[in-house]
Amino acid sequence: LKSFKGTKDGVPFEDTQYPVESIAELSRQGIPDLVALLSSPNPTISALSILSAQLDGAVLMGHSQAGAFPLGTALLKPDMVRAMMLIEPGSCSPDTWTDEQIAVFAKIPLLVVDGDHLDAPTYLPVGTPGWQARFDGCERFIARVRKANGQADMLHPPRLGIHGNSHMIMQDKKNLQIADLITKWLDAQTNEMLHKQTSLLR
């Protein structure tokens, strides 16, 4: 995980926001990755679409390997997904989606959130895209959604002068600051949707 590593093993980045003294506890939460054994499409996406319908609409957030789950859910139940937030997604697959699928995403507010130190190694198998490549891919994905007249944004804290966030943004010391930024974005989308609904009633 990029911000748990520094310029060399055992030395975290000076500005890291992750509580490095807790890394051992984090590692104990790990379980074997069994995603390769799942059927395709991933049954979690189907379950999310059912849950969204039961709730009569939901705002979906995905992180890391599950980062794209909101997108898959939107394709199954586009009218039940109110907004999508992808936190450090494993990939935005910018060149995989068809124009028709992009058109679906363009109808739902979308936010991608990425941390810091994109040039750090991932320590994943050779050939796996690095952090910068993943970030660039999400930027291209956002551009495609915007080109289709969608509301899509990238929240990259370093651009706002907020540095040191890790892959586990929700556990970082500045997690509440990032949460506030996400909440403000979501509030803005809610206000925009209410404005459109009000305009239709006039």
Put a short name on every predicted segment.
Residues 41-59:
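Conserved acidic catalytic loop of the alpha/beta-hydrolase fold
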Residues 89-157:
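The feature captures the conserved acid-bearing segment of alpha/beta-hydrolase catalytic domains
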Residues 72-76:
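Active-site signature of alpha/beta-hydrolase-fold catalytic machinery across serine-
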Residues 1-37:
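Active-site machinery of serine-nucleophile hydrolases
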Residues 164, 168-202:
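Catalytic active-site module of serine/aspartate enzymes centered on a nucleophile-bearing elbow/loop
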